[in-house]
Design a protein with these regions (language model features):
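Non-catalytic cap/lid and distal C-terminal segments of serine-dependent acyl enzymes
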Residues: 1-143
């Protein structure tokens, strides 16, 4: 099992799709696909850090793209992690979460659950509640 919030949620999706035999279930909270973020190399420190981590250019067709990794598992007919994904309605990155939601909802090969809570944003109160729901999803605790 692996789970994370925000950037950590993206990282958990990335690692679970890269190593599904090790991470059979993933919880991703407020976690969009970073490959869906438009990148403008403006010379800022943030841009330079991104280039050091991922390289310069489009990440969609690289190992850093969540949907790219998910497509590879389908093509290879590999095992796939179960995915619990949640985001607050007021989260500033809700659009990136919707892109992932739409992708996984349209690919029945994945055991995927999405939860979106009204009137809550990118915050710990939401993540604490969703972590409990994720643990129920895993079967580690009862409802």
């Amino acid at each position: 099992y692996v789970s994370g919030f925000s950037n950590g949620g993206y990282g958990c999706l990335h690692i679970a799709l890269k190593y599904p035999e090790k991470y059979g279930t993933v919880g991703a909270f407020s976690a969009g696909d970073k490959a869906d973020s438009e990148f403008l190399n403006d010379g800022s420190e943030k841009s330079l850090r991104r280039i050091q981590l991922y390289g310069d250019g489009d990440l969609h067709k690289t190992e850093y793209g969540i949907t790219y990794q998910a497509d590879k598992l389908i093509e290879q007919e590999s095992i796939k992690p179960r995915i619990y994904h949640a985001c607050g309605e007021l989260d500033p990155w809700i659009d990136m979460n919707h892109i992932l939601r739409d992708y996984f909802m349209s690919h029945i090969e994945y055991d995927y659950v999405y939860d979106e809570i009204e009137q809550i944003g990118h915050e710990w109160k939401f993540w604490r509640e969703e972590l409990k729901r994720f643990l129920v999803f895993t079967g580690l605790i009862n409802n």
